Design a protein with these regions (language model features):
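Alpha-helical solenoid repeat scaffolds of the TPR/TPR-like class and their adjacent stem/linker regions
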Residues: 1-229, 241, 251, 279-287, ...
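Conserved hydrophobic helix-helix packing surfaces used for dimerization/oligomerization
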Residues: 62-66, 236, 265
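A conserved nucleotide-sugar
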Residues: 91-93, 254-284, 289
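Substrate-binding clefts and catalytic carboxylate motifs of secreted carbohydrate-active enzymes
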Residues: 235-248, 255
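Residues lining hydrophobic/aromatic ligand-binding pockets adjacent to catalytic sites
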Residues: 292
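A short structural motif in glycosyltransferase catalytic domains
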Residues: 316-318
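Short alpha-helix at the nucleotide-sugar/activated-sugar donor binding site of glycosyltransferases
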Residues: 328-330, 353
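Short acidic/histidine- and often glycine-rich active-site loop of Leloir-type glycosyltransferases
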Residues: 345-356, 361
Length: 368
């Protein structure tokens, strides 16, 4: 068998959120990842002298940098795209450090046009990227990756800016000594649980940004018939990644289908093997397999438009919906969620509260 410590070292911090909502375990996992895979500050020498920077910053705009591999057609890019237009240009000078794949798309073009300085750093090693950020004189650098694919945590360990903030990309504490703040809200990090985060907690009313100008219509408009859904039955949907579907939540979905005759569960198409396995689990629970309907891949605009065909979005647990919940709420579909203890398990409840529908936040799995 594998002991708990070995398990923590073997699993990526982001993956752990699919299996547990224990914030202490998540912190330990993130901490171990930083210590073993990234390194500790004593191993890095920062050449920067920030002492004089504060004085020099008086009388000029605050320089804010966003470091991300996802400022493109990606869940994070969709959420953030509208935010860059809203920065107060008289107070802030905005830099984007893009560390993603070299693709061109509408979201990336929009963000690039909205920031004053766009830097491509994917091809730069840590030394070159560090030199670039230091030369730009960034005051606050926002790490929009955290423990996700495309992160440059090693670069952050070398302190490219006096203040480094963990926000949005990774739903949890970095467990690192090189992230000074985490942006949260009263729901994702409830007052009193700050001790489970190595960063200092800063709260907004809701931590997740959204783009109010996002294109949502599709031509032709989607229909239930075209989507393979029954015209007059209740359609429950969950467009979360299948890795978030746990036995705990699937069992409750099957109970809901048993209680709602004719109702269907509309999920995102995964690979054939996963779809068949889910239908097999449904059959084992006494539910006709065809009551699980799988939505094929679609463009983001088409995907958003088809949300309107659903009656209720059912959240997963312990790793809940984040961008997918926002999508549903924007398209007028209520979201049912049962919050857990950790950050990733509480995002959906935060969004549902922000949307003004707290009655859809369940107090227990039974209530769900």
């Amino acid at each position: 068998g594998m002991d708990r410590a070995a398990l923590l070292r073997a699993i990526a911090p982001l993956s752990l959120a699919n299996y547990t909502d224990d914030p202490m375990l998540q912190l330990a996992c993130a901490h171990a990842h930083c210590r073993e895979d990234v390194g500790w500050p004593s191993e890095f020498r920062s050449t920067a002298d920030f002492a004089g920077r504060v004085e020099a910053a008086r009388g000029r705009r605050l320089r804010i940098g966003y470091l991300s591999s996802d400022l493109r057609d990606h869940a994070i890019g969709y959420l953030m795209a509208g935010m860059f237009d809203l920065h107060d240009r008289s107070a802030c000078e905005v830099f984007a450090y893009y560390n993603g794949i070299p693709q061109e798309d509408a979201t990336k073009a929009r963000i690039r046009g909205a920031v004053e300085h766009w830097r491509e750093i994917a091809a730069l090693d840590d030394d070159a990227a560090l030199g670039l950020i230091l030369a730009d004189g960034i005051d606050i650098l926002v790490d929009v990756n955290g423990h996700t694919r495309g992160a440059r945590t090693r670069l952050l360990a070398r302190r490219p800016a006096p203040i480094v903030v963990n926000w949005l990309g990774y739903p949890g504490s970095m467990g690192s000594p090189y992230h000074h703040y985490i942006i949260a809200d009263p729901y994702v990090i409830p007052p009193g649980s700050e001790g489970l985060y190595t960063e200092r907690v800063v709260r907004l009313p809701c931590y997740q940004p959204n783009d109010r100008l996002r294109p949502t219509g599709a031509d032709p408009a989607p229909t239930r018939r075209a989507a393979g859904l029954p015209e007059d039955a209740t359609v429950f949907c969950c467009f979360n990644g299948t890795q978030k579907i746990t036995p705990f939540v699937f069992e409750r979905w099957m109970r809901i289908l048993r209680d709602v005759p004719g109702g269907v569960l509309w999920l995102l198409k995964s690979c054939e093997e996963v779809d068949l396995r889910l239908r097999g689990h449904a059959a084992a629970a006494g539910i006709a397999p065809e009551r699980l309907v799988f939505a094929p891949l679609a463009t983001n605009r088409e995907h958003l438009a088809r949300y309107a065909l659903a009656d209720l979005f059912l959240d997963t647990a312990p790793y809940g919906a984040h961008t997918t919940a926002s999508d549903a709420l924007w398209m007028g579909v209520p979201v049912l969620t049962v919050p857990g203890r950790g950050f990733a398990a509480r995002v959906c409840a935060s969004l549902v509260h922000a949307a003004g529908a707290p009655e859809f936040v369940c107090s227990s799995p039974e209530a769900y």
